């Protein structure tokens, strides 16, 4: 007889579509931790621009409908949910520039941005749920790293949307300063258009020089100068 795979096996877990919910937050609350924040980042893979992190504490009575991993949503739907999240939740955003990424590495820069976002929440979190494998060091509260967290926790999903929309807006603003690379179209990812721009014009000050295939860049404005008001 063929052996059946347990229902909680990693194989089935990876193949069954997940819908984020509030169960992890309620579990933390039952353990005495409240409020609970979700945290996520956007922009680990691009060749240019910052990595942006967001931390979100949702109001259980005002959770926007349709929260999901930002990558599963259209740009229009992300924008709609972004507005709703800002109107109903406690939100904090932080970023690490391309310079910071080059000085350390993308993992450390991402975790540092996430730490600063969490620590800057107007309402201090009692517990944090983070997407991925790591909880940022240096927090004032305990936390839990959740693999595929943006597909499991609505708080992490909300943070993923805030981080993604914020970063996309920053890169659209960057396009106005550096129009030769098409940042508004690809947000700094290594598309054919972007690589062609680098080949023709060389890198600018927003490029991550520690990422292949980049070389020494030019002077120019830092990403903080491009954050939309």
UniProtKB/Swiss-Prot annotation:
A divalent metal cation binds at residues 40-41, 131. It is an enzyme of class 3 (hydrolase). Residues 34-223 form the RNase H type-2 domain. InterPro entries: RNase_HII, RNase_HII/HIII, RNase_HII/HIII_dom, RNaseH-like_sf, RNaseH_sf. Residues 220-229 have a biased composition (Acidic residues). Belongs to the RNase HII family. SUPFAM superfamilies: Ribonuclease H-like. This is Ribonuclease HII. Keywords: Cytoplasm, Endonuclease, Hydrolase, Manganese, Metal-binding, Nuclease. The lineage of its organism: Bacteria, Pseudomonadati, Pseudomonadota, Alphaproteobacteria, Hyphomicrobiales. Its EC number is 3.1.26.4. It is found in: Cytoplasm. It comes from Rhizobium etli (strain ATCC 51251 / DSM 11541 / JCM 21823 / NBRC 15573 / CFN 42). Its cofactor is Mn(2+); Mg(2+). Disulfide bonds: none annotated. GO terms for cellular component: cytoplasm; ribonuclease H2 complex. It catalyses: Endonucleolytic cleavage to 5'-phosphomonoester. GO terms for biological process: DNA replication, removal of RNA primer; mismatch repair.
